[in-house]
């Protein structure tokens, strides 16, 4: 299909979006170079604090505003929405010749142009939903960060398409055109119904509560939209072909990776609300993407369901010969997996390490192999029973798509790093910590804060943290806050430790985030710093509020938040 003259405006809007992103990617590369050079200079000249110049102060102030908006999506949406609408106005094409009704104020011309524009935005929205997105590689970021663009471009596309339909209905009513049995109108009504279903299913409250239903409905409606718009008008076919090509390419790559990375996983139930999984590292292939610490994979367990795929954060790093996952048990897929573990009859297995097992095998896995020496008490008085994790294990085939995530560990470029996690969120911050300690970087000081209420999880993770404590060549402070119903200090395994330049502490209360973040900013001074946090929505909100209260205009800090 040859593009018509009017399509130039739609192509112009698509090009504008991509050009802006390419420009942003170039600025991001320049920022990384600036941070790397500043951190390298500081590392070579320890304890040399230079006050930022006037130009750097202005730059940091502008950067703070950008980071604030990037980490507060609601405020960014309020600012960007009217700007996007203003930019959209020129692309509606009021100068378009009205060949249908010359007496009209160009109503049909504007309505048609809005239809083309919405098709173009649907294509861009599909593009940013791809797991295999080239902009992720350019920005050293995860496809999850593109979801913001995917969602809001979809919203704008829906609003513009609805306006397109309303204008044509007004014209049809004025011109006494058929509204109910016209072919184009009928497909338009079907498109409206499907878009309404997608909008309702995509609401945050609905999406979180019924994620599995949302996943199925969202993808089904996405395919329906393509074919309905295809049938709606012949001039839209070229845009829908583009959507089909990129959608099929992405799905094909993911399917190939899932089959290629099929392997046996050993799955343990640490306690009533925590699952541990360990398996073979993903194979290298032409379709594999580069990944770094803090990445995630999509897991499918055929013995539970062939159709359900769920994302989980990797607690291992790229240089490991294995991958491990810590999974919190919620309703749905993870609950069924936990019930499967409960229902299986077990005898205590003798997990001797097979010949050729790498020495780098995780402390977690080795600790599980020796877990028989003690029992974990479930903190549930209604149950009142104890069990040992080895008695609740499963070995099964897993299809694994990924890993996906950042292509490099950006935290390596900063002088000071603060890692904060709540609960199973430590599976995101732990591999970053390991990567910073075991690999060469510009970091001179790391603070690791973790709040946890699971005693068994704390015991398993403390082995890895203790090992890192004695391997660290930089200043390392590990702070563990146990929020369970009993005291972790009753066990001799959770004792404070100090080495030449590192220390690890245990506390039986909630962390005072305001105090920790303020101390970190005071310690950083004018040098480069990075903060990474992972936890629940409320946990991250507390951290963001603490950062906003403590940050100054000269603080040179990068912030990254991962919501569980």
From Swiss-Prot:
SUPFAM superfamilies: Ferredoxin reductase-like, C-terminal NADP-linked domain, Riboflavin synthase domain-like. GO terms for cellular component: endoplasmic reticulum membrane; plasma membrane. Heme 2 binds at residues 164, 232. The keyword Cytoplasm does not apply. Residues 254-410 form the FAD-binding FR-type domain. FAD binds at residues 310-316. Residues 114-229 form the Ferric oxidoreductase domain. InterPro entries: Cyt_b245_heavy_chain, FAD-bd_8, FAD-bd_FR_type, Fe3_Rdtase_TM_dom, Fe_red_NAD-bd_6, Ferric/Cupric_Reductase, FNR_nucleotide-bd, Riboflavin_synthase-like_b-brl. It comes from the Eukaryota. The keyword Phosphoprotein does not apply. The chain crosses the membrane at residues 10-30, 66-86, 110-130, 152-172, 184-204, 210-230. It catalyses: 2 a Fe(II)-siderophore + NADP(+) + H(+) = 2 a Fe(III)-siderophore + NADPH. Heme 1 binds at residues 150, 218. Its EC number is 1.16.1.9. It is found in: Cell membrane; Endoplasmic reticulum membrane. Keywords: Cell membrane, Electron transport, Endoplasmic reticulum, FAD, Flavoprotein, Glycoprotein, Heme, Ion transport, Iron, Iron transport, Membrane, Metal-binding, NADP, Oxidoreductase, Transmembrane, Transmembrane helix, Transport. GO terms for biological process: copper ion import; iron ion transmembrane transport; reductive iron assimilation; siderophore transport. NAD(+) binds at residues 419-427. Glycans are attached at residues 106, 261, 350, 442, 496, 548. GO terms for molecular function: ferric-chelate reductase (NADPH) activity; ferric-chelate reductase activity; flavin adenine dinucleotide binding; iron ion binding. PANTHER family: FERRIC/CUPRIC REDUCTASE TRANSMEMBRANE COMPONENT, FRP1P. Belongs to the ferric reductase (FRE) family. This is Ferric/cupric reductase transmembrane component 2.
């Amino acid at each position: 299909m040859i593009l018509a003259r009017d399509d130039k405006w739609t192509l112009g809007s698509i090009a504008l979006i991509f050009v802006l992103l390419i420009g942003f990617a170039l600025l991001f590369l320049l920022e990384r170079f600036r941070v790397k050079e500043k951190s390298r200079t500081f590392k070579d000249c320890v304890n040399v604090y230079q006050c930022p110049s006037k130009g750097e102060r202005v730059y940091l102030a502008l950067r703070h505003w950008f980071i604030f908006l990037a980490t507060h999506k609601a405020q960014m949406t309020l600012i960007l929405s009217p700007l996007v609408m203003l930019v959209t106005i020129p692309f509606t094409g009021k100068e378009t010749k009205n060949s249908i009704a010359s007496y009209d104020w160009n109503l049909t011309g504007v309505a048609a142009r809005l239809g083309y524009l919405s098709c173009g935005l649907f294509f861009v929205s599909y593009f940013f939903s791809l797991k295999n997105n080239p902009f992720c590689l350019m920005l050293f970021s995860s496809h999850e960060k593109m979801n913001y663009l995917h969602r809001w471009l979809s919203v704008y596309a829906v609003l513009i398409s609805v306006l397109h339909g309303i204008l044509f209905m007004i014209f049809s009513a004025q011109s006494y055109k058929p509204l109910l049995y016209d072919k184009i109108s009928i497909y338009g009504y079907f498109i409206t119904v499907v878009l309404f279903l997608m909008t309702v299913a995509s609401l945050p409250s609905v999406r979180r509560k019924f994620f599995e239903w949302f996943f199925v409905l969202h993808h089904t409606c996405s395919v329906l939209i393509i074919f309905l718009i295809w049938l709606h008008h012949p001039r839209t076919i070229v845009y829908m072909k583009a959507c089909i090509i990129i959608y099929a390419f992405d799905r094909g790559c993911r399917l190939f990776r899932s089959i290629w990375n099929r392997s046996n996983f050993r799955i343990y139930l640490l306690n009533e609300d925590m699952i541990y999984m360990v398996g073979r590292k993903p194979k290298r292939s032409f379709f594999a993407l580069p990944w770094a610490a803090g990445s995630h994979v999509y897991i499918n367990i055929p013995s539970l369901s062939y159709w359900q795929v769920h994302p989980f954060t990797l607690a291992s790093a790229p240089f490991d010969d294995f991958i491990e996952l810590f999974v919190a048990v919620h309703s749905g897929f993870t609950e069924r997996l936990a019930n499967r573990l409960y229902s299986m009859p077990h005898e205590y297995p003798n997990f001797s390490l097979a010949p050729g097992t790498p020495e780098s095998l995780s402390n977690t896995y080795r600790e599980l192999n020796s877990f028989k020496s003690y029992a974990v008490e479930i903190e549930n008085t209604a149950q009142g029973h104890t069990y040992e994790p080895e008695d609740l294990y499963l070995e099964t085939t897993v299809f694994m798509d990924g890993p996906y995530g950042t292509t490099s560990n950006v935290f390596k470029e900063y002088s000071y790093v603060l890692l904060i996690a709540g609960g199973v969120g430590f599976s995101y911050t732990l591999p970053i910590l390991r990567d910073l300690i075991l690999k060469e970087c510009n970091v001179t000081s790391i603070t690791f804060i973790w709040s946890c209420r699971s005693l068994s999880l704390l015991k398993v993770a403390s082995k890895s943290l203790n090992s890192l404590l004695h391997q660290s060549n930089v200043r390392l402070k590990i702070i563990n806050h146990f929020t369970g119903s009993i005291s972790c200090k009753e066990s001799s395994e959770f004792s404070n430790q100090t080495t030449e330049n590192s220390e690890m502490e245990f506390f039986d209360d909630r962390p005072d985030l305001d105090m920790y973040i303020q101390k970190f900013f005071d310690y950083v001074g004018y040098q480069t710093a990075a903060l990474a946090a992972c936890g629940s929505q409320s946990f991250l909100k507390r951290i963001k509020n603490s950062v906003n209260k403590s940050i100054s205009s000269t603080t040179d800090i990068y912030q990254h938040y991962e919501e569980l």
